[in-house]
Amino acid sequence: MSHIRHLAQQCRDAARRLATLSTDAKRRLLETMATALNTDAATILAANAADLDAARTQQVGTAMLDRLALDPQRLAAMADALRDIAALPDPVGQVTRDDQRPNGIHVQKIRVPLGVIAMIYEARPNVTADAAALCIKAGNGIILRGGSEAIRSNIAIATALQRALRLASLPETALILVQDMARHTMLELLQLSDLIDLVIPRGGEGLIRFVAEHARIPVIKHYKGVCHQFVDASADIEMAIRLLIDGKTTRPAACNALETLLVHTDIAPRFLPAAAAALRPYGVQLRGDHATCTLLPDVVLATDADYAAEYLDLILAIRIVPNVDAALEHIRRYGSDHTEVIVTADPAHADTFVQQLYSAVVMVNASSRFSDGGALGLGAEIGISTTRLHAYGPMGLDALTVERFVVRGQGQVRH
């Protein structure tokens, strides 16, 4: 048996223990995990500093460095997030259907854990803690395979979380961190359909394509966020600028940050100069079509690649469009089914935008940055699914369970 298969088998065995834990036991476990992160803060931050030094040596971009970096505040927020997850309602055992059939059988549909989930991700060490906590809260075993750029941070975080499992008299193999960064090891992991029930890739386009093409296990992709804001002719200009500033500048490396601004031609002469002036203090580089460049001479002429790009940086592509339909056509061509925003005072245009787009999250007069599990009331998320399956959009605890039927009778037969 190969090493990676052995680890997956251990995780599957441990997952059976997790599946039977009471809600209270899981709450105490996650609180202990949060305390372990606080206790190991110095070790985790030192490991992260080493990862950052290595990343700078390799001259990685500022967006990657931002996703990779931890500081005392971010680490404290990670621990607090685990406490928040501990306090969430337990989805396991929830009855979603309860029906007494005419023949007397009692039919229930009940949430149960998926089993073992493999999370393959890049850069963000907070995902190590968040994904582990969410999967464990839902009664699942978790196999984590982070990126090489965060390997030291991930080892330090996983070590703290595994210690909490031991303190709870649970097998630490309920949480496996794959430390072999070789591509062939990840490829082998993706073949283990008898031991792993779901793979969730979260990272760059290359990683997600590799996982989708090679996995023999069901995959829920967390694809790039090419998010748009369309400013309709009837939009409140002050509101549109406020949403633009929030969506583009508060955390440009986030997947729910805006990448493209679409502007109705009737409002463009009034809106775009004001928007450009509002963005200037934040250092946002603008790239626009010919019509935009006519209104804003300092703007760089955009290419097709600009409209398809997930910049994760202070860069914004702009296009002026004649109507809502043209905005929808642009989004269908260049978007990634993540999050789209319309700013409008026209209810009919808002309804058209919502009904004709199939993106995971559609906002009407609200910031793209609300495309987040916590902001949408899920409490926490393992990521934002762009795969049109049962889990679409921010994935909370419910999405890490499945529903099965439990039927009780008194000897009834079908025929």
Curated annotation (Swiss-Prot):
Q: Where does the UniProt annotation locate this protein?
A: Cytoplasm
Q: Which UniProt keywords apply?
A: Amino-acid biosynthesis, Cytoplasm, NADP, Oxidoreductase, Proline biosynthesis
Q: What PANTHER family does the entry give?
A: DELTA-1-PYRROLINE-5-CARBOXYLATE SYNTHASE, GLUTAMATE SEMIALDEHYDE DEHYDROGENASE
Which coarse location class applies to the principal site listed for this UniProt protein? cytoplasm
Family to which the UniProt record says this protein belongs: Belongs to the gamma-glutamyl phosphate reductase family.
Gene Ontology cellular-component terms listed: cytoplasm
Provide the catalytic activity annotation.
Answer: L-glutamate 5-semialdehyde + phosphate + NADP(+) = L-glutamyl 5-phosphate + NADPH + H(+)
* Gene Ontology molecular function, alphabetical: glutamate-5-semialdehyde dehydrogenase activity; NADP binding
Q: Which organism is it from?
A: Xylella fastidiosa (strain 9a5c)
Q: What is its EC number?
A: 1.2.1.41
Protein name, UniProt field: Gamma-glutamyl phosphate reductase
Matching SUPFAM superfamilies, A to Z?
ALDH-like
What domain of life does the native source organism fall in?
Bacteria
- Enzyme class, spelled out: oxidoreductase
